[in-house]
Amino acid sequence: MQTPVSVNEKKDFIRWFLNHYQLKRRECVWILNYLMSHDSLMEKVHFVEQAEFCPRGIIMSTHCVEEVPFRFYKENVMTTDAEKSFHDIRLNKQQDLFIQLNFRSAYNSPEYAAVLEANPHIPKDLYENEKDKIVAEQILEHSIATFQRQKLLREIDEALDRQDKESFEKLAKQLSQLR
């Protein structure tokens, strides 16, 4: 079981994060500063991956990544309105709040690793589906490569039958690059 992250560790991380990265939406900075100013709220804050699966989750992104600037999830509703989410945070201080931060080199950051918690709300079969997707992609890549190789071999045979040295050399080069 993972050791709970202390309020001070979370605050230190947010300070570090705000000093090193610029969020795409200024309201995100306001939300993080508001959370830091209330220890009771910080106790309910959890930094996780895939916050869209959480009962109450926020996704915030910095300028250095391509992900969406801001999203707030509550139950089955999603909004990009930061003011609505801020209002919800103030009214529901007793509820857990799961925050996903998208920033460059997030997974190489010891500061982030120190506060990142396992997301208890990720569906159990999600990773199974991801594994299946990876295997399917590998099978597809293998099938395409096999098809291309067989096609080139047929074309090489035809070039040899025609005694077309130029086509043979071109096709043989393509075959060697494929391997």
Swiss-Prot record:
InterPro entries associated with the record: IDEAL_dom, UPF0302, UPF0302_N, UPF0302_N_sf, Virus_scaffolding_prot_C
Chain segments annotated as coiled-coil in the UniProt record: none
Domain of life: Bacteria
Ranges annotated as spanning the membrane: none
Protein family (similarity comment): Belongs to the UPF0302 family.
Name of the protein described by the UniProt record: UPF0302 protein BLi02393/BL02764
Organism of provenance: Bacillus licheniformis (strain ATCC 14580 / DSM 13 / JCM 2505 / CCUG 7422 / NBRC 12200 / NCIMB 9375 / NCTC 10341 / NRRL NRS-1264 / Gibson 46)
